[in-house]
């Protein structure tokens, strides 16, 4: 809980800065580039976690990362702030929180849509239209197929779940019959 609070605080500050400067999308790309380096080079996060490395050495490593990713000056300053505040360990959580907050800022929802089979373009468009109408936001769905489903669709947007699966409908009918 504390970790996610820290990550959200830093991500929110970065989204606000990005909004002021018109760089929300650029920051998203720069964060993704740095996160890719962290993921593909395990020595990088290990270096920031190493208490034997001096603070100045860690800042130099971050400066090298910023240079190799061609990050903006603002992003570079943000990443150096993470080093100064000893928050680099929260970087992946900050990136995730930034993505969510940036999406919210620009009016994007990324629902997870689960079905028993692959949706065709018409079905997907109908679901997307309904969600856009209900939410008044742009919908970028993540599609998953669960062969355990009998049929129907489950849409999850954040903590909200819209469940129109056959299993849930059968359960409702069973509950109504038992109530008599």
Swiss-Prot record:
SS bond list: none
MF-aspect GO terms: proton-transporting ATP synthase activity, rotational mechanism
Broad class of the protein's primary localization: membrane
Localisation: Cell inner membrane
Highest taxon listed in the record's lineage: Bacteria
Function: F(1)F(0) ATP synthase produces ATP from ADP in the presence of a proton or sodium gradient. F-type ATPases consist of two structural domains, F(1) containing the extramembraneous catalytic core and F(0) containing the membrane proton channel, linked together by a central stalk and a peripheral stalk. During catalysis, ATP synthesis in the catalytic domain of F(1) is coupled via a rotary mechanism of the central stalk subunits to proton translocation. This protein is part of the stalk that links CF(0) to CF(1). It either transmits conformational changes from CF(0) to CF(1) or is implicated in proton conduction.
Family, similarity comment: Belongs to the ATPase delta chain family.
Entry protein name: ATP synthase subunit delta
